[in-house]
Each structure stands twice: as C-alpha cells, then as structure tokens.
Curated annotation (Swiss-Prot):
The protein's assembly and partners: The glycine cleavage system is composed of four proteins: P, T, L and H.
BP GO terms, sorted: glycine decarboxylation via glycine cleavage system
Membrane-spanning residues: none
Cross-referenced Pfam families: GCV_H (PF01597)
N6-lipoyllysine modification, residue list: K66
Family the UniProt entry places it in: Belongs to the GcvH family.
Keywords carried by this UniProt record: Lipoyl
Names of required cofactors: (R)-lipoate
Protein name: Glycine cleavage system H protein
C-alpha cells in the first residue's frame, strides 16, 4: 500500500479528519487514509452555516459504495460554510482529499489544536493500522 499522505500545515484527529487553520478559520476534511479505506464516495451530508460543532463530536456523514461513516470535528466552533460542491461531486474527496474541505469553522480554541496529531504522528498512527 502506498504511504499515506499527510501534508505539512495540516493537523489530524485519530478518527482521520484533518484541519487546516487559515487565520481565524479552520477548514475540515477527511484524510487520504480515510478516503482510501472508504472507497468510492457517493454522498456527503454536511451541516448548514450557523450550526455549532464540538471537538471530536459528529458533524455529518459520509457514504461510500462500501459503508456510511460519521464525520467528527477535529475542532469545535461555528460552521460558517459547508462545501456545497461536494453535494454535486462527492468523489472529489477521493481524488483530492486535502483540497476537498467539508466545513469551515470559526471560534475554535487554539488549545484544541494541541489535542491533534502532527503529520508525522498521524503517519505513525496510520502505519500501525495498515
């Protein structure tokens, strides 16, 4: 199996979601490992703007030809945008997992970031699972 991608500038949860901080906004998506394990993604159910999410709690669902899985927020805060393009092209999560953010969140705590994994630590976690 090819080495899992975990680019610099991203932090990861043990549930395989990623977060990329841009100023006071956090973009959230799923990792390369997660999309590969799920297989062809056919549907993504995401929250509307204004919803509050809490760290490590569910914020939506993702469905593939193999399974349906909950999505977990790596940081908490207020959803300011959901990626509507994924409703038309959910397969983008497979082909571009780090460009296919699912939600944008504001109001997260920087202390929450300390509970996440660096790319190196995430790769080590995934290596144990493969």
């Amino acid at each position: 199996m090819a080495e899992t991608q975990a680019p610099a500038g991203y932090l990861f949860s043990e549930k395989h979601e990623w977060v990329k901080v841009e100023g006071d906004t956090a973009l959230i998506g799923i990792s390369d490992f997660a999309q590969s394990a799920l297989g062809d993604i056919v549907f993504v159910d995401l929250p509307k703007s204004g919803k509050t999410v809490k760290q490590f709690e569910t914020f939506g669902t993702i469905e593939s030809v193999k399974a349906a899985e909950d999505l977990y927020a790596p940081v908490g805060g207020e959803v300011i945008e959901s990626n509507s393009a994924l409703s038309k092209n959910p397969g983008d999560v497979n082909s571009k997992p780090f460009d296919s953010w699912m939600i944008k969140v504001k109001g997260f705590s920087t202390s929450e970031l300390e509970k996440l994994l660096s790319p190196e630590k995430y790769k080590a976690l995934v290596a144990k699972l493969e």
